[in-house]
């Protein structure tokens, strides 16, 4: 198992912890990207000057070109480009994918200022790569300005230089490919870092991706060349005329046909070299991206116990219970999962007692954070079910009044008493919920990329629509209806536009009825919404995919899966390794949390579209595993409960739990779940 050793625990800010954990990984991935660059340049030079009829001369000329000063200069320039691309990979990575609920939300995300900056920089870097590739190709592609070949141009000294449209075509194609790469980077969630299920050595992971990388680059470059030819056919005359005017160059149509015509674009040599330039660009950029993913998701070992009491900020219990960068939290939970399965010595540190005092601080901190994460998931599932059951309306008692951490900690370790009769079902007990972490929402079709609404941050599943009025009643949080709905106009008006004049205040005073003008405005707005909902183009951009909201609920489920596996493995190992019985004191709370979550998951998967599996793209360089995280989470939850029940067996009958949970626990003991 390939893991990275960590240094001693040390204090510092979250950014310091991030740099200590990821700093050397980032630098190493950039160094390897630059080291692989000469190999890519060599392959490009050999393939760009291919000559099958004279292979000896072809290979000797390629070797001479590689050692020329011109190629060495381009190597240094391309190394700078790779470093800039790697920096953008570091700045834009995320461990939680961004899921857009509609096409308009996706467009809004792409037009975010940060994404636009990313696209423009990549377009400029793509043009720089194309310039280097054009010069290394030599021949008719190496220069922007060439002598005119016409006899009329030789008579006038001012008309002796002409624009080389081949070189211009190269430069513009590089900018187009760079922009297309950036566009696909966000559309396909390529900034998402998927953590490997099985830990492997970095070399093996890169070697496994190498063939797929080359294949993907060749195919994607082919499509980019096709798209660029279409764009250049319609708009190629604009940059050509602008550059000719700015540099006072003439167009030599006698040397070759203009490239913004069908005959000019049917140049096999030009298309081949542009396609090869695109393959070279994509291979180098994708290599940098893959190397960063491999190094960033490598397992990191966090020490369980600090060597000194004042240096504990980088230790596992402290990292889990603090608010570090999200990737550090993911690495800590991954380390918890690994130590719970493969490290008996570190498990003993988790079960150990503090000296002096004899308190299980390590186990308390780790189990508390795991239970908080699982309770958060239960809360999100209940909120989603309530929203689906009430057609977008949701009671605010689950999220408006969050508990403090201390209260959540006390409740998490309190043994549930069967004699207590709750006033609400166990799934919606707010005492079990911890608002510590939240899941990114499905983007609203009208939501701007500059921020999210308060309702979205609280519930994590609500849709925001500017057509819907803000909720006036303090007892309800309402989700604005979609642009199209199957309910009648009166129902829509009653659900989405609660009149402030028709509500009852907290003191019981009735507010006057709405005025005629207010009712007229509401009716006109409903008529406009109904009119727009019948337009196909509006439907195309504003329609919400039901799969998107489902994926958003489980977008960060990977850390919940690790919390489940780590907690269940530790509980199972405590049956034989826990000498002090620290786990037994919290076993009722753990079982209560797991069974409550199991009930919420079972109800969730009965909702429409929840059980439908999206099509799985096999053999693709782009990872889409986040689309099926809900199925992995359900399987991990059931496996975690079975892991505990098979280990403790009939001893669990002595655990104090409610009658409903005792019945569910018995089903697991009898393998009937």
UniProtKB/Swiss-Prot annotation:
Residues 47-71, 137-166, 248-261 are perinuclear space. GO terms for cellular component: actin cytoskeleton; cytoplasm; nuclear envelope; nuclear membrane; nuclear pore; plasma membrane. Signal peptide: none annotated. The modification Phosphoserine is found at residues 407, 438, 444, 470, 473. One of its GO terms (molecular function) is structural constituent of nuclear pore. Its main location: nucleus. GO terms for biological process: homologous chromosome pairing at meiosis; mRNA transport; nuclear pore complex assembly; nuclear pore localization; nucleocytoplasmic transport; protein transport; spermatogenesis. Pfam families: Ndc1_Nup. The modification Phosphothreonine is found at residues 415, 439, 448. Residues 1-25, 93-115, 188-226, 283-673 are cytoplasmic. It comes from the Eukaryota. It is a multi-pass membrane protein. Belongs to the NDC1 family. Interacts with the NUP35/NUP53. This is Nucleoporin NDC1.
């Amino acid at each position: 198992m390939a893991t990275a050793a960590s240094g001693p625990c040390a204090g510092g800010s979250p950014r310091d912890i991030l740099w200590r954990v990821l700093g050397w990984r980032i630098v190493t991935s950039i160094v390897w990207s630059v080291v692989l660059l000469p190999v890519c340049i060599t392959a490009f030079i050999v393939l760009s000057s291919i000559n099958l009829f004279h292979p000896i001369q072809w290979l000797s000329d390629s070797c001479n070109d590689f050692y020329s000063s011109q190629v060495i200069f381009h190597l240094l320039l391309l190394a700078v480009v790779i470093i800039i691309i790697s920096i953008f990979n570091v700045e834009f990575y995320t461990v939680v994918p961004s899921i857009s609920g509609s096409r308009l939300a996706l467009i809004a995300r792409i037009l975010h200022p940060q994404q636009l900056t990313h696209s423009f920089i990549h377009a400029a870097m793509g043009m720089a790569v194309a310039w280097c590739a054009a010069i290394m190709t030599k021949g008719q592609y190496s220069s922007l300005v060439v002598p005119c070949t016409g006899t009329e141009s030789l008579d006038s000294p001012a008309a002796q230089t002409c624009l080389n449209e081949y070189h211009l075509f190269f430069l513009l194609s590089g900018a187009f490919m760079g922009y297309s790469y950036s566009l696909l980077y966000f559309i396909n969630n390529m900034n998402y870092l998927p953590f490997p299920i099985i830990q492997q050595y970095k070399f093996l992971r890169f070697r496994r991706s190498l063939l797929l990388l080359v294949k993907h680059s060749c195919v994607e470059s082919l499509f980019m060349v096709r798209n660029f030819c279409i764009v250049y056919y319609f708009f190629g005359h604009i940059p050509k005329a602008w550059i000719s005017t700015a540099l006072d160059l003439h167009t030599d149509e006698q040397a070759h046909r203009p490239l913004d015509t069908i005959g000019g674009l049917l140049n096999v040599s030009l298309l081949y070299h542009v396609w090869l330039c695109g393959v070279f660009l994509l291979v180098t950029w994708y290599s940098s991206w893959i190397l960063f993913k491999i190094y960033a998701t490598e397992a990191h070992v966090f020490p369980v116990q600090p060597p000194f009491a004042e240096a504990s900020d980088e230790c596992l219990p402290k990292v889990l219970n603090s608010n570090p960068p999200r990737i550090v939290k993911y690495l800590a939970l991954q380390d918890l999962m690994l130590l719970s399965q493969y490290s008996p010595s570190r498990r003993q540190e988790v079960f150990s007692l503090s000296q002096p005092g004899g308190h299980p601080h390590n186990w308390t901190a780790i189990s508390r954070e795991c239970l908080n994460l699982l309770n958060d998931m239960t809360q999100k599932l209940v909120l989603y079910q309530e929203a689906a059951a009430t057609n977008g309306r949701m009671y605010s008692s689950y999220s408006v009044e969050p508990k403090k951490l201390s209260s959540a900690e006390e409740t998490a370790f309190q043994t549930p008493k069967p004699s207590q009769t709750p006033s609400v079902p166990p799934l919606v007990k707010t005492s079990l919920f911890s608002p510590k972490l939240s899941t990114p929402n499905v983007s609203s079709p009208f939501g701007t990329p500059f921020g999210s609404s308060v309702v979205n941050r609280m519930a994590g599943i609500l849709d925001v629509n500017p057509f819907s009025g803000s909720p006036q009643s303090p007892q309800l949080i309402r989700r604005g209806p979609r642009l199209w709905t199957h309910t009648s106009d009166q129902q829509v008006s009653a659900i989405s536009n609660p009149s402030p004049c028709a509500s009852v205040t907290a003191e019981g005073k009735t507010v006057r009825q709405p005025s005629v003008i207010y009712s007229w405005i509401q009716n006109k707005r409903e008529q406009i919404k109904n009119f727009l909902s019948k337009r196909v183009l509006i439907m195309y951009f504003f329609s919400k995919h039901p799969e998107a909201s489902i994926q958003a609920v489980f977008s960060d489920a990977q850390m919940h899966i690790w919390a489940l596996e780590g907690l269940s493995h530790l509980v199972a190992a405590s049956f034989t390794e826990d000498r002090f019985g620290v786990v037994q004191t919290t076993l009722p709370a753990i079982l209560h949390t797991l069974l409550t979550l199991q009930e919420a998951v079972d109800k969730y998967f009965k909702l429409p579209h929840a059980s439908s599996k999206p099509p799985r793209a096999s053999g693709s360089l782009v990872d889409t595993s986040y689309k099926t995280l809900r199925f992995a989470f359900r399987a991990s939850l059931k496996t975690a409960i079975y892991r505990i029940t098979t280990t403790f067996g009939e001893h669990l009958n002595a655990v104090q739990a409610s009658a409903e949970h005792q019945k569910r626990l018995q089903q697991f003991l009898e393998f009937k779940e």
